[in-house]
Swiss-Prot record:
Disruption phenotype: Mice display a severe osteopetrotic phenotype characterized with an increased bone mass. Show a reduction in the osteoclast surface/bone surface and eroded surface/bone surface ratio, but the osteoclast number/bone surface ratio is normal. Show also a reduction in nuclei/osteoclast ratio. Exhibit an impairment in TNFSF11//RANKL-mediated osteoclast fusion. Show a slight inhibition of osteoblast differentiation.
Region (Disordered) residue spans: 170-212, 609-633, 1319-1349
Biased composition (Basic residues): 609-631
Described purpose of this protein according to its UniProt entry: Acts as a transcriptional coregulator, that can have both coactivator and corepressor functions. Inhibits the DCSTAMP-repressive activity of TAL1, hence enhancing the access of the transcription factor MITF to the DC-STAMP promoter in osteoclast. Plays a role in bone homeostasis; required as a positive regulator in TNFSF11//RANKL-mediated osteoclast fusion via a DCSTAMP-dependent pathway. May also be required in the regulation of osteoblast differentiation. Involved in the transcriptional corepression of NF-kappaB in macrophages. Plays a role as a regulator in the pro-inflammatory cascade.
Oligomeric form and interacting partners: Interacts with TAL1; this interaction inhibits TAL1 occupancy of the DCSTAMP promoter, leading to the activation of the DCSTAMP promoter by the transcription factor MITF.
Higher taxonomy: Eukaryota, Metazoa, Chordata, Craniata, Vertebrata
Tissue: Expressed in the spleen and bone marrow, and to a lesser extent in the kidney, liver, brain, skin, heart and muscle. Expressed predominantly in osteoclasts, and to a lesser extent in T-cells, B-cells and osteoblasts. Expressed in macrophages.
Gene it is expressed from: Sbno2
Protein name as annotated: Protein strawberry notch homolog 2
Keywords: Activator, Differentiation, Osteogenesis, Repressor, Transcription, Transcription regulation
Length: 1349
């Protein structure tokens, strides 16, 4: 590897190949503790994994290997915490919402409701990605690079462990035998036992059942939707063109559109249904419903122009009454002749501009003119995640601008990933979550509050959204779907090519930097943006190319089994093919290497130079003609006035370049880029990339820079002879050519091989068909069976249906193969929705092809676990369900950021990480640190920015950027670095789990246990913004976790393993032997069941089992089992074993080993009390973290709420009583006031129009008081302030979105009257603080609705 010049600190040694052998044996320094020998399983649990050696997986003690333990999937939230100042959430981060609900939340929003459908058992899944878990507070340990000095990361792991008292330390040291197994029992109460519930509309009773099985997440299924008050105008159809769940979504959307937000805009609705449920028909139904009510115009925005035909199909399928669909791309800028119908456009069309002047300079202005003033029709933002990053892109701003300029429009957001990441919600301004009259003035405030609240906060938000009637999210069950992972080893020859490429890129970095220094280039942001963009694409192409041969073999095998194949790609590599064509005057003699093209294009177009190289298309660019013209590469578009619309895109030149594996530079440029006028530059020979400056280094500099450039080009061309050719062309060629393969991508032409062996370039266009229709024709050929292989790219396949549809001729089972997996499970599921949709004959098979590069297997595990949780089955060996914890596979959270920070600081600064290095690295520790430091510098990570012209490396190195960059390391180096990062990540999580600070999201309370009962319930009123009166339920839950003898016997009869069965302990304690039932899982690991605690969370090894227990018959086990089961109902383990317990003798409660566990939780308006409860808990336990749990009682009632540790119960109850008294005091004050005089209603309310979507609390929750109202208050008296007084009264219009039983008609009528008639007479004053004048409080009641409402 050629030496890379560092960006700082002088020279460093050139690359040396690692010496052979030299594997080292590492010892875990965490293990040198006197207490480790007895408690190593509970102190340092490990992850069970087939491909990773995680931290501590093989601990050493005195040179002897300790028994390996497995990672427990359950975790405890103990009532005692370590006194530490480093917590994932500080108390202040929760105060900004202490008295403000994010949404209007009904009284029973989070309380229990009967659960009629049965749960589908699934496995550990965090339903919502934990991207929001990243703390927005800039702390020392979260910084990317610590240049010098000791690394101030989170507290020292050893200190953390030793300073945190073990659970055993809370018991008397005179009872050592009592404490055995204590910690494993304590971890029983929480776990990830994810379930999905079969979805059936609960309050909508119209329509027939959906043709396929649909499920809803267990969290959302725990809360009810609002009552239906809207009556559809859609005619009933005997053909059942709309299913019951589609009609339900239409009803709730139209019902929400009747609500006005405090800003005066009409409320919007979010359809979060997954792929295949039928969002298209639902949207079409909303448009038809409004058409029948006289609103004849609608806007429909989507990701691709091709989806216009799908929109027409959806309208036709539901028998729409002749509604025309007009494509905006086919309408001239000055043409507004279309009077009604649906105007269909892409998001990129919103920023289109006309070069010819005329009446309409922009598409946005043309759309506004077409809609007309006072437009109240439907605006559909389909696949609305394409509009993300709205604050930083011109397209996103246009989406927001359109909504603000049409305030009365009925907005519908449709996206399967819409509410999964709060950052993606910035364009959803009509949900009323932030803005005027809400707790959050801006979206940034909302985002900051949610991100700081931890993993479960967004799930609570989604639940409140559902309760409020603004959100619905269902997804197709993956029942019947199968998948498998194909691991493809890298051949030695390919590894050599890969390593050569990595070294050449390191040299290129040095050469680029040297050339920039020589010419005195000051601004380098765009230069390095282009460099790292090309770097990412180059190695992505190499990763894909390694899998092509195996994919062709698998595809041919599946075709021979009478199946058909769908291959998913992210990009096409067409840009390089067109460049070679231009260089060779339209002739080709071989397939083109996309990887080589990326490298050459970077050097030719962006190498630092004082001359402007006038490339094709340079200068002032014209708008692309309506027919799709030649595709411009991403590199050539950067500096020429191009707006890039892609995941992670930004107006900054280098933003978003290191997004994900699923970024598709060429195809995104083709489909999502609009070329506008480039900024005008002086006609200097230097490009816009470089500042106008004099040649400061003399005339010889230009020649020297040119020599550097030509030398680098020669080396790239030499390497290019060994690089793989274009993946897409190679696949089509090896699978039979264009005659056998249906290509649905965005490219215009392809390279094909003729029978005589020659290679030619041909257009994909066909006679009589425009290029826009080629993909549709190819889809028809695949669905009819004319072609049995389809290749789709992400950019062009959005919304395309390729399932084994009952209505098409080709009903062979689909085998969906993917060469690239995105690093987000949500995005992967979205892609798989192309072949798994409603009304299919057979479910598809998925094949993930992965290599051994940079942890690809770990990312495949993320997607596999998500598929399993949705009901899919793997062909391979299923892991034990209790070991599935998806959270450990997600790096995009605060633990990933901290792990990255720690790894970089350790490698660059040699600080102590306390995490063992990867075993067996050639050369040992010294070689590892030397190679990793040099490698990080060679990929631009870890360097610092200076004015002397060194590398401009982003300060905020994200996880995705890190994972992309390390692909540029040699194979053995990137795998070792990824392993080290992964081990550090796991270690940080384990530390926080030990100290009770790990945020595991929403967990299930006592998963797998049916004996859960609600013992008692107390009701408290909570203060809130802008009205009081929301209800919080305090519940005491009892869990009987014991296992009856009959249940144990039934389970034992099903066991077949040689070591399965009942066991008795060798040790006799209190004249009794311990009894258990062991069930072998995989290898030597056993799941253990005990009569008092049921299933034990930790797995036991065969060695530990046989050391303490011996096998017995069923007859021998019965008496000890039944005795232990009966005694443990009221007696702790200490009493059972020793006939006494020190804690009970002291008058305290001991729950050790008891069957019956008591838990305390809060349900109801959680967001209103979150801040105050967190503050109380912080005082008691030094942690403000609130664990959100869900459960299902034995009588099938589901509950979601905050679990209160037993030690905090007393203080929490005191706080609830204070809040309740405060609210009741205000209510009493309001009852004593004279209610306002009823006035005539002047605001019309047509049939079916509902302005009040609120609930009344259950009668038992709060006794029905007489009718009362808050009166208007006089101007404030500075000398007299009422105790507990709140801020000045809010304008009534700001109350319109709250569900506190507000009489909206009266509020709106009062507003209109005040606007028309001016100030009115002030009612009799009352002592207090308020706005006075013309303002008056809204009527609030806890009884049935008012007669006039």
């Amino acid at each position: 590897m050629l030496a890379v010049e560092p960006t700082m600190d002088g020279d460093f040694p050139p690359h040396e190949l690692p010496p052979p052998g030299g594997g080292i044996q590492l010892q875990n320094r965490l293990l040198h503790c006197p207490w480790w020998g007895s408690f190593s399983p509970s102190l340092y649990p490990t992850f069970s994994s087939e491909n990773q050696q995680f931290v501590g997986s093989t601990p050493f003690l005195g040179g002897q290997s300790c028994p390996e333990t497995s990672y427990p999937t359950t975790a405890t939230v103990p009532s005692f915490f370590s006194k530490s100042s480093d917590f994932p959430q500080d108390p202040s981060c929760l105060e900004d919402l202490s008295n403000a609900s994010v949404f209007s939340s009904s009284v029973d929003s989070l309380s229990d409701i009967p659960d009629t459908p049965d749960f589908l058992q699934a496995d550990s899944l965090n339903e919502v990605p934990t991207i929001w878990d990243v703390s927005t507070t800039s702390t020392t340990h979260d910084k990317l690079f610590i240049p010098s000095g000791p690394f101030s990361a989170p507290e020292d792991p050893v200190t953390s462990l030793s300073s945190t008292p073990l659970l055993i330390s809370y018991q008397s040291h005179s009872q050592p035998e009592e404490e055995e197994g204590e910690e494993e029992e304590e971890t029983e109460e929480l776990g990830h036992a994810e379930t999905y519930a079969d979805y059936v509309p609960s309050k909508s009773k119209i329509g027939k059942q959906h043709p396929d099985r649909v499920v809803e997440t267990s969290t959302l299924s725990s809360v009810p939707p609002p009552d239906i008050t809207y009556t559809l105008a859609l005619p009933t159809s005997d053909n059942s063109t709309l299913s019951a769940l589609q009609l339900e979504a239409i009803t709730y959307a139209c019902q929400q559109h009747e609500v006005l937000l405090p800003s005066g805009q009409r409320a919007g609705f979010l359809i979060g249904d997954g792929a295949g449920v039928g969002k298209g028909r639902t949207v079409a139904g909303i448009i038809v419903e409004n058409y029948l009510r006289g609103r004849k115009k609608a806007l429909w925005f989507s990701a691709s122009n091709d989806l216009k035909y799908d929109a027409e199909r959806d309208l036709r399928d539901i028998e729409a009454p002749g509604i025309a669909v007009h494509a905006l791309s086919k309408i001239k800028y000055g043409d507004n002749t279309t009077s009604e119908g649906v105007l269909f456009a892409t998001y990129s069309a919103l920023i289109g501009e006309s070069q010819a002047g005329g009446q309409h300079r922009t598409r946005l202005r043309q759309i506004l003119q077409w809609c007309g003033e006072g437009f109240d029709g439907v605006i559909v933002f389909d696949e609305c995640h394409k509009a993300k990053n709205a604050s930083s892109t011109k397209m996103g701003k246009a989406v927001l601008d359109l909504q603000s300029k049409l305030p009365q429009a009925r907005v519908v957001y449709a996206s399967a990933t819409g509410a999964s990441e709060p950052r993606n919600m910035i364009y959803m301004s009509r949900l009323g979550i932030w803005g005027e009259g809400t707790p959050f003035r801006t979206f940034e405030e909302f985002l900051h509050a949610i991100e700081k609240r931890g993993v479960g906060a967004m799930e609570i938000v989604a639940m409140d959204m559902k309760v409020s009637g603004m959100y619905i999210a269902r997804q197709l069950s993956f029942s019947g779907v199968t998948f498998r992972i194909e691991e493809i080893p890298l051949s030695p020859a390919f590894q050599q090519v890969y390593n050569r490429a990595a070294r050449l890129w390191a040299e290129a970095l040095s050469v680029f930097q040297q050339a920039a220094d020589w010419i005195g280039l000051e601004s380098r942001k765009s230069l390095w943006g282009q460099f790292w963009s090309a770097h990412q694409r180059f190695f992505k192409y190499l990763c894909i190319a390694a899998k092509v041969h195996r994919l062709v073999e698998l595809a041919q095998q599946e075709l021979s089994r009478d199946k058909c194949v769908v291959i998913g790609l992210q990009s096409t590599g067409e840009a390089r093919t067109r460049e070679v064509l231009d260089e060779n005057e339209g002739r080709l003699d071989c397939f083109v290497s996309a990887a080589e093209g990326v490298f050459l294009s970077l050097i030719q177009k962006h190498f630092p130079s004082t001359r402007r190289r006038r490339d094709r298309g340079g200068g002032k660019r014209k708008r692309r003609p309506r027919g799709r013209g030649p595709k411009a590469s991403r590199l050539s578009l950067e500096a020429a006035g191009v707006i890039r619309i892609s995941d992670g895109s930004s107006t900054e030149s280098d933003a978003g370049l290191d997004s994900d594996f699923n970024s598709s530079p060429e195809s995104l440029v083709d489909d999502d880029v609009v070329i506008v006028d480039a900024p005008t530059h002086p006609t200097d020979d230097r490009g816009s990339l470089y500042p106008l400056q004099r040649d400061l280094q003399g005339p010889g500099v230009v020649e020297r820079v040119e020599r550097l450039k030509q030398g680098l080009l020669a080396k790239v061309r030499a390497l290019g002879r060994e690089l793989p050719v274009n993946t897409l062309d190679q696949l089509i060629h090896q699978l039979g050519g264009p005659e056998c393969v249906a290509e649905m991508t965005g490219r215009k032409g392809r390279v094909v091989s003729r029978p005589d062996g020659t290679v030619v370039f041909e257009s994909r266009a066909e006679q009589g068909l425009s290029i826009d229709h080629v993909n549709l024709r190819e889809k028809q050929r695949f669905m009819s069976g004319e072609k049995l292989v389809a290749i789709i790219s992400e950019a062009s396949s959005s919304g395309v249906s390729l399932q084994a549809d009952r209505r098409v001729q080709n009903q062979r089972r689909r085998v969906h193969m993917t060469l690239e997996l995105p690093w987000s499970a949500d995005r992967a599921i979205q892609q798989f929705g192309r072949t798994h949709r409603s009304n299919q004959v057979s479910a598809p098979e998925y094949v993930f092809l992965i290599s051994e590069l940079a942890g690809e297997r770990r990312f495949a595990s993320i997607v596999a676990k998500r598929l399993e949780s949705l009901g899919a089955l793997t062909h391979g060996d299923r892991r034990a369900t209790e070991s599935r914890d998806l959270s450990k596979y997600n790096f995009e959270n605060k633990y990933g950021a901290r792990a990255l920070s720690r790894v970089l600081a350790t490698i660059m600064g040699q600080t102590d990480n306390r995490v063992p290095l990867p075993q067996g690295y050639p050369g040992g520790d010294t070689a590892f640190f030397r190679d990793m430091k040099q490698g990080l510098l060679s990929v631009g990570i870890g360097s610092r920015e200076s004015r002397s012209g060194c590398l401009d490396v982003e300060k905020d190195c994200s996880i995705t950027k890190f994972l992309n960059r390390i692909l540029g390391l040699e194979v053995h180096k990137q795998n070792a670095l990824f392993q080290y990062f992964s081990d550090t990540f796991d270690h940080l999580i384990e530390i926080d789990k030990k100290e009770g600070r790990y945020d595991m999201g929403i967990l299930d309370l006592a998963p797998g246990i049916n004996e859960i009962h609600e013992e008692s319930q107390q009701v408290f009123l909570a203060p809130g913004h802008p009205q009081d009166g929301q209800v919080v339920f305090y519940k005491q839950i009892s869990v009987d976790r014991g296992m009856k003898w009959e249940e144990a016997l039934t389970r034992s009869l099903e066991l077949k393993g040689p070591y399965d069965g009942f066991y008795l302990s060798y040790k006799v304690r209190g004249s009794k032997m311990s009894c258990l039932l062991a069930e072998q899982n995989r290898g030597e690991y056993f799941t253990v069941y005990k009569p008092n605690i049921g299933r034990q969370s930790q797995l036991e090894t065969l060695d530990s089992l046989c050391r303490k227990f011996h096998r017995v018959t069923v007859e021998e086990a019965r008496e000890p089992w039944e005795s232990s089961y009966a005694l443990s109902l009221e007696h702790c383990s200490h009493t059972t074993w020793n006939q006494r317990c020190r804690l009970t003798q002291e008058g305290k409660c001991c729950a050790q080993g008891l069957r019956l566990r008591h838990h305390y939780m809060l349900c109801g308006a959680l967001l209103r009390v979150w801040g105050r409860i967190a503050a109380v808990m912080a005082d008691v336990s030094s942690s403000s973290y609130l664990q959100i749990v869900r459960l299902k009682t034995k009588d099938k009632k589901k509950q979601v709420g905050i679990k209160i540790p037993e030690g905090c119960v007393h203080r929490v109850l005191q706080e609830l009583q204070l809040m309740d008294a405060e609210v009741k005091r205000r209510s009493t004050h309001g009852l004593a006031a004279r209610p306002p005089t009823p006035r005539a209603i002047t605001l019309p309310c047509g049939p079916g129009e509902v302005l009040d979507l609120t609930y009344s609390p259950p009668a038992e929750a709060f006794p029905t008081p007489p009718r009362f109202a808050f009166p208007s208050l006089p101007p404030p008296d500075p000398s007299s302030l009422m105790l507990g007084a709140r801020d000045p009264a809010t304008n009534p219009v700001e109350l319109a979105h709250q569900s506190c039983d507000i009489n909206f008609r009266e509020v709106l009528e009062d507003m209109l009257r005040s606007l028309r008639a001016g100030p009115t007479e002030t009612p009799a004053p009352l002592v207090g603080v308020g706005g006075g004048g013309t303002e008056r409080q809204s009527v609030i009641h806890f009884s049935p609705p008012f007669p006039n409402s």
